[in-house]
Amino acid sequence: LFNEQSPRGPDYNDGHDFWTEEQRMDVYQQWIHKTRYARYLEEFQRRENWGETVSRYTGFFEDRLDLKLTEFGRAILDLDVMPSMRCLMTAGKALERDACAGYNCSYLPIDSPRAFDEIMYVLMCGTGVGFSVERQYINQLPEVAEEFHDTDTVIVVRDSKIGWATAVREMVSLLYSGRVPKWDLSRVRQAGSRLKTFGGRASGPEPIDKLFKHMVSIFTHAKGRKLNSLECHDLVCYIGEAVVVGGVRRSATISLSNLTDDRMRHAKSGQWFIENGQRSLANNSVAYTEMPDTGAFLREWTSLYESKSGERGIFNRQAAKDMVPERRDNNYDFGVNPCSEILLRPREFCNLSEIVCRPNDTLATIRKKVTQATWIGTIQATLTDFRYLSAPWKRNTEEERLLGVSLTGIMDCPAILHASDKELQGLRDHAVKENVSAAKLLGIPESAAITCVKPSGTVSQLVNSSSGIHPRHSSHFIRRVRNDKKDPISQAMIEAGVPYHSDPRNDGSWVFEFGMKSPKGAITRHDITALQHLDIWKRFALNWCEHKPSITVSVRENEWVE
């Protein structure tokens, strides 16, 4: 509980009454906090409560920037706005060491062998990665050697994020030259060991051992030619599969490919989830660079329908260039983050913050939250001292200082759901104005793009709101979550009587089941049609977003032709 024993003491609350998670959060919200964002306090032999987590986050930036963030801390504490949840998790020594860990979003094309180890590092920092296997990029890769032979070279994998990334870099370099090395994993700590700086528990040596075996297989099958798009895609998926914390996957990616790329069009067709389960690690989208003819579009649309997975999705790069704000340089081939709400230059980061829209909010209270979320995002944008990565990452991130100020709970909040175009534009312009003020105070460039709507999968669960621009799933449903069997919280959940079973795909994890009930009168996915949902998306895309809204549309069988 947040009390006088807290590291920053009672003064943090600025005279407000102390409160516990039990007073503001139900058991599932507490689960999300404890398993995703709470750090272990050695001094007290327990995990943080919510107040201590918020205090650690605000204290990190107060000490770093010599600012007082009491108002913003209170807004986060009360679940009115949310910062980058990557920052919330890692604020402290972990974020001091790896600034990359404070960012939610990144993008890079697979145009260099270095792309693979940079992806490993970025994913291990907890940042989502968008990547492209379009031919104009993968054609820049070198040819794989014509012959392969085993060598006595040994890759010694050091037990750190940079250690793993460096090992991937060495492996790629050796395989391109036709040499198959041995690898030494003796320095990698055992599965279940607590990660004191970054948080969570170690995955052990097995994931990187499996990754190296897959890498050897892919490269040897490509001897004498360049890697094709699907091979590059699978390499990234295997890298993502290796990024595991405490037996639970911790990576998010999206893959962009050409319209005419049949390999990628059918990457998730048939029994792919059995034969190529690694492909579940990436969302797949086609990148349009011009208006396709009707036949080409219908072939892609039919493939999307027949896949039953909603993939490949559709990303129109030219439309993305046309929609960016005037102050942003659009002479770049933008890509996207895994949830596709942020437009990014190649090798660039973006941090997110979030406005929680409640049923009783008014435009005035939302405007105040816009101010708070924009300042929080701008403060987070000061983190640009990146380790390990190539120079363009720092250059692009510092030049644009991208923010992703998002709205969640839109369907719960009549004031924002039914806001006029002019009112949404006013809120967007207010965010831009507040960023100008914050950037001036902090001595950094103004942000090139600010507003978006992210899907808010985890944040909405933490704050108990509908997700982003989506309706609630149903009036009643079961939420299933995975957790490491060795985690003491798993045992606590079992003792508390939470239903559970073993994860059929991972013997090291339990699957816990939480019964969920939506608020009375909440809009659910059964209450709106696909076209109505898209109309709402369009209104927020045109009037609120300087990036774009991320949306998942539930399409009934009779709605596809419409």
Regions found by a protein language model. Name each.
Residues 1-562:
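Extended catalytic cores of very large enzyme megasubunits
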